[in-house]
Amino acid sequence: QSNDDFIWNAVAGAEFPGSTVTAEADGFKTLISGSTANVRVATGTSATAITGSTAYTQLTGMIAAADPNIVDASDLTFFCGISVFQRIVNGLTTQNLFHFDPTTVKSRGGFYEVPLPGYPNVVIVGGWGLRSSERVILGPASDMYVGTDLTSDTSNYQLWYDINSDTIKYRLRNKLGTQVGHAHYYVSNDLA
């Protein structure tokens, strides 16, 4: 959860909340925003916070705003926080879309995923990193990159038993960074 939080919310040069780590690179939320050159920003209804009654219209509006070169990408993905994801699923369920099956929601280690009805190549992913945000981002998942320096883990890893709390604890110091390949492939509603 902490890594996912960092991957999405890091701001270069700022100390990450709840830690002593100063981020050296921006997270996806900063990289895929209206302040980044070429990122498309949703307009109209799609630029507002997702509500159950308008979720489908808002998401399809973001698809309409996407670069035509990626609309048929096999991994086109909406990224959002878990609470926004729940509103989307609730909205799709209450709209009684004949081709939406709420039992298709998958839980994958703290992430949730469901296909977007009517779009066989589009999934909606709710994750920890955007949990306190109304931000919704659309783009090809394969164009988002996370890098790390895992080769140094053996020298930066500590494991110990804490007798006071009767727990095994560990500390791992490594570098973690994010990047997108093509900013113009992404659409953001640009909400906080």
Residue ranges and their predicted role:
Residues 25-52, 87-192:
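Sequence/fold signature of self-assembling virion shell proteins
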Residues 16, 64-68, 73, 112, ...:
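Short, flexible coil/linker segments at or flanking structured domains
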Residues 47-96, 104:
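Ordered core of a single globular domain
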Residues 5-14, 72-76, 100-108:
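Short glycine-rich, low-complexity/disordered patches
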Residues 2-4, 82, 126:
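Internal mixed-charge
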Residues 1-64:
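Alpha-helical scaffold segments that mediate packing/assembly in large oligomeric complexes
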